[in-house]
């Protein structure tokens, strides 16, 4: 890539846990040596019950291990989770177990999005039928506060600046955590 596009400053890729799992560490290091500097991966939740309900196809431990694999191979890791994904029933577990998954991976970047229900999806059907309740802004903020109270991912940049978020946050961990909580 650098030979064809010398002006290219960085190369990054989205990856699923499955696409990382099928690659050996040697293959991932080769990709790094060829210029791949960062991998974006969706965690969505660190709570296995949420992951099962949302049909993610992977459990938290596997996602964490694939994140660690990327880091071992010398690439930066950006991991995203979704506030509100556990609904009111799993709010606390979703927040705490997601923080624990971030802590275990210690990615360079942590991104938080707020759940948006897309028309025509199974989730939209569950909401319509009453089997899933979308959290309101106050509960999203409570969940975010709980996650921040439990997150301990030294050196990670925490971003919650997507248009879906009620409260934009951006800073480093752990130094900006208290500022976020205040």
Kindly label every feature range from the protein language model.
Residues 1-61, 65, 70-72, 152:
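Conserved SAM/AdoMet-binding glycine-rich loop
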Residues 14-18, 44-48, 82-86, 115-117, ...:
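Active-site beta-loop-alpha junctions enriched in small/polar residues
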Residues 22, 52-56, 84-87, 117, ...:
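Generic structural "secondary-structure junction" signal
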Residues 23-24, 90, 169-170:
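A short acidic (Asp/Glu
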Residues 26, 54-62, 89-97, 131-139, ...:
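Alpha-helix N-cap and loop-to-helix initiation/capping positions
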Residues 38, 61-122, 137-161:
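Conserved C-terminal portion of the radical SAM core fold
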Residues 122-131:
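Short, glycine-/aromatic-enriched active-site segment of Class I SAM-dependent methyltransferases
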Residues 166-182:
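Radical SAM enzyme core and accessory elements
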């Amino acid at each position: 890539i650098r030979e064809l596009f010398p002006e290219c400053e960085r190369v990054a890729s989205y990856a699923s846990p499955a696409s990382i799992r099928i690659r050996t560490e040697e293959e991932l290091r080769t990709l790094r040596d060829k210029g791949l500097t960062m991998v974006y991966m969706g965690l969505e939740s660190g709570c296995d019950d949420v992951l099962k309900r949302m049909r993610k196809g992977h459990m938290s431990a596997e996602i964490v291990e694939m994140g660690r694999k990327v880091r071992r191979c010398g690439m930066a890791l950006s991991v995203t989770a979704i506030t509100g994904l556990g609904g009111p029933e799993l709010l606390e577990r979703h927040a705490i177990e997601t923080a624990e998954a971030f802590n275990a991976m210690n990615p360079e970047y942590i991104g938080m999005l707020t759940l948006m229900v897309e028309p025509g999806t199974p989730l939209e059907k569950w909401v319509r039928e009453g089997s899933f309740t979308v959290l309101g802004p106050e509960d999203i903020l409570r969940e975010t506060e709980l996650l921040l109270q439990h997150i301990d991912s030294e050196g990670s940049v925490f971003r919650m600046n997507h248009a879906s978020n009620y409260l934009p946050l951006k800073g480093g961990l752990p130094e900006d955590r208290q500022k976020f909580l205040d």
